[in-house]
């Protein structure tokens, strides 16, 4: 499957400690929330300007499900937050950005193996949802797609931008710090999966369980290959399949 299943070794300064990783991770998380909130605030201000009697709380609640806003917020936060992650790696003054974030090329057959794994997982997850009678498509995504206005922007945000930031942050920065701490690679897989699941609290219980399981698969791929590219490709493929499923569902609804 891969010729490198051990964590990266460093001859000089190692990644941030576990507490440094957690602390700086929280900083990135806060910046992410602030940037997303700033985009939302701009949309709310626009609504209030058009109608001064607008209930700000209700406007924010409704706009939080707006697909166009989601896409725009994602496209704004992705480059800025990735830039912050890169800055934090440089502040460590030792590990290279490529090594720290797992920017390591891998064999094509290894990539195809992991893409096959995620495709199989997507099929099994959908079969389980069907057998259990769970909703075919989350209401949150249906509502979001109804307000995308420009679908290509939404697709780019979910298939390219969101996976790029999330993998650089979770399976890149956080994973590398955790796997070189006392929790080791196994702890890194668990902790990054948990943190990534918390990021998606807008979904229901089944979806959150699926997201955690996905995080575990992504984390194992990162661990076994010591590369961010397999989880990044799997993440994009899974989102692509989910978007195709959403369009199919709306076409039948």
What do the predicted segments below correspond to?
Residues 1-100, 240-253:
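N-terminal, membrane-interfacial amphipathic/helix-forming hydrophobic leader that caps
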Residues 34-35, 186-197, 201, 205-253:
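Functionally important transmembrane alpha-helices
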Residues 77-81, 154-157, 210-218:
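Hydrophobic core segments of transmembrane alpha-helices in multi-pass, intramembrane catalytic enzymes
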Residues 85-90, 125-129, 158, 196, ...:
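Structural signal for membrane-spanning alpha-helices in multi-pass inner-membrane proteins
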